[in-house]
């Protein structure tokens, strides 16, 4: 893998990672070093197929964007991969470990964490308390250990120190004593991202991190997402903001109607006809009458002949009207 320059974010010039795939950017292409591998994952709701992913690999150490129109199955796939939902069939592996049937909290402890489009901060806890909840394997969570302060006091202090360091990194340190309910939408997004790092993950999955964010905080969120990669983490995020995707993503996966229809570097994917079809429809430049079957599909020559016939008839009608 190699890196190419990408436009600067803030005051820091970032590098885009290239050479992630073993072949051309087609759906299901093998990656040089995948951290997440999906095989034959399907999710049905009655007669509706929400997800049908034959094969997908997420490259390690890169930022991958998962895009597609509303209802494409992106969040459903996220829920399946994180253990929040169960697939109808298929398997997937994180870092070589099969995750099928493993509950969400165990998936997170293994190093694969996620955030949500609608933030899950506990409103009646302070920002610092929310952060401390993100730390796994706390001695004080075990009943007998919680009765002996000598067991949990030192780990508790270490957890609090780590939480404060992350809050400072995300510029939320001045809010540590505030209730989470008092934060703005963008600040809650930052809190969720910071809390996810309390478990020292290898793969961070962000579900629409820019949704509902004040424009003033957009740049800060972009910087922090790029910062995850700088810290050696892999990022997989769902997003509708194509400018953001083009700006920070190393690799893009496009879903439509539950399937992966395209993948590759952002500059290539944005020009893929399958992507245009997914967002605008496969018949965006075809007469609606032809699409619905109200009129037949005609050749260009036939179309010209019909147009000339109509024009001739119109001219004849005008001449007839002009006669005294």
Give the ranges of each region predicted by the language model.
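N-terminal acidic, proline/glycine-rich, low-complexity intrinsically disordered segments
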Residues: 1-12
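Glycine-rich phosphate-binding loops of nucleotide-dependent enzymes
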Residues: 10-324
């Amino acid at each position: 893998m190699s890196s190419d320059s990408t436009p600067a974010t803030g005051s820091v010039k970032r590098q885009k990672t290239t050479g992630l795939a073993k072949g051309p950017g087609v759906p299901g292409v093998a990656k040089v070093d995948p951290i997440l591998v999906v095989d034959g994952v399907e999710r049905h709701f009655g007669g509706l197929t929400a997800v049908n992913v034959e094969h997908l690999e997420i490259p390690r150490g890169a930022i991958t964007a998962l895009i597609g129109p509303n209802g494409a199955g992106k969040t459903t796939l996220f829920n399946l991969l994180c253990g929040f939902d169960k697939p109808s069939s298929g398997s997937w592996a994180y870092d070589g470990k099969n995750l099928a049937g493993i509950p969400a909290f165990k998936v997170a402890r293994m190093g694969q964490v996620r955030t949500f489009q609608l933030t899950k901060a506990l409103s009646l806890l302070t920002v610092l308390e929310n952060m401390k909840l993100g730390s796994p394997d706390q001695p004080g969570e075990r009943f007998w250990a919680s009765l002996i302060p000598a067991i949990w006091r030192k780990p508790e202090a270490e957890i609090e120190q780590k939480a404060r360091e992350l809050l400072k990194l995300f510029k939320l340190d001045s809010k540590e004593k505030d209730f989470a309910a008092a934060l703005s939408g963008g600040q809650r997004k930052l809190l969720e991202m910071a809390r996810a790092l309390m478990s020292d993950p290898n793969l961070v999955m962000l579900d629409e991190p820019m949704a509902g964010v004040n424009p003033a905080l957009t740049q800060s969120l972009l910087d922090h997402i790029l910062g995850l990669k700088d810290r050696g983490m892999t990022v997989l995020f769902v997003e509708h903001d194509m400018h953001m995707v083009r700006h920070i993503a190393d690799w893009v996966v496009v879903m439509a109607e539950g399937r992966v229809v395209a993948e590759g570097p952002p500059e290539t994917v944005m020009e893929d006809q399958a992507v245009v079809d997914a967002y605008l429809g496969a018949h965006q430049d075809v007469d609606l009458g032809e699409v619905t079957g109200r009129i037949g599909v005609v050749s260009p020559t036939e179309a010209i002949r019909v147009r000339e016939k109509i024009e001739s008839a119109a001219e004849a009608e005008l001449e007839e009207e002009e006669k005294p």
